[in-house]
UniProtKB/Swiss-Prot annotation:
Protein name: Taurine import ATP-binding protein TauB 2
Recorded superkingdom: Bacteria
Predominant location category: membrane
Gene field: tauB2
Stored PANTHER family: TAURINE IMPORT ATP-BINDING PROTEIN TAUB, TAURINE IMPORT ATP-BINDING PROTEIN-RELATED
Membrane topology classification: Peripheral membrane protein
Protein source organism: Paraburkholderia xenovorans (strain LB400)
Source lineage: Bacteria, Pseudomonadati, Pseudomonadota, Betaproteobacteria, Burkholderiales
Amino acid sequence: MENMTVRNVSVVFPGRGPGQTVQALDDINLTIRSGDFVVALGASGCGKTTLLSLMAGFIAPSRGELLLGGEPIAGPGADRGVVFQKHALLPWLNVIDNAEFGLKLQGVPRAQRRDIAVRNLALVGLQDFHKHMIYQLSGGMQQRVGIARALTCDPAMLLMDEPMAALDALTRETIQELLLDVWKKTSKMFFFITHSVEEALFLASRLIVMSPRPGRITHTYDLDFNRRFLETRDARAIKSSPDFIAMRERVLNIIYGDEKMHAAGAGVAHV
């Protein structure tokens, strides 16, 4: 069983002026286990995307270490699939060629990679769209292709950076439910970033709330709304339940309180 371990991690970026620095993350400690769906929530600039970029191996920490399966993360790897806010698909390839592209780069034989891509496209409900070009798909369908592509290399972990931010409300809810189905069927580690409190509560088995810069994990909640959905298939009933509403208000109060404190410290007035 592979775990993602983030141990005493801080990140400092160069500032705008000579000798200036900006601390993006401060002393982050987090363990994500197989079968965890961890969602990071916080105000803009709290370091959520920086934390995901560290896990993906796109950047290195200024201090601390990140381990996957006990091995240090030294860069991007096939053991981590990434889904971005913008789908990053290749427009000159059709759906199935996009889905199998990572395996092609690894030199996997065509018949084998095609079989894997077919299975993963079926997992996200695109079994009838193999030959469609990307421009022929809706935004939600394009994100489904991105999810299928991330799954084809059988990563231990899926990293998702606000993948539904540009989708309409109905499509967003559909993709949320799809993600929970994929999570249930694969038991992979998920690390998901969002600005939506409702989305975070619905998806997360564990929610981490981060403070504004420097980003710190200030609150952690173990949740079961996702499992309740998988049992009942009634998202509306769950999102309108008293405990869901109470948790939403609790988290909103934390985030708004953090934003006000950060603005006051920066000398910004909120009207």
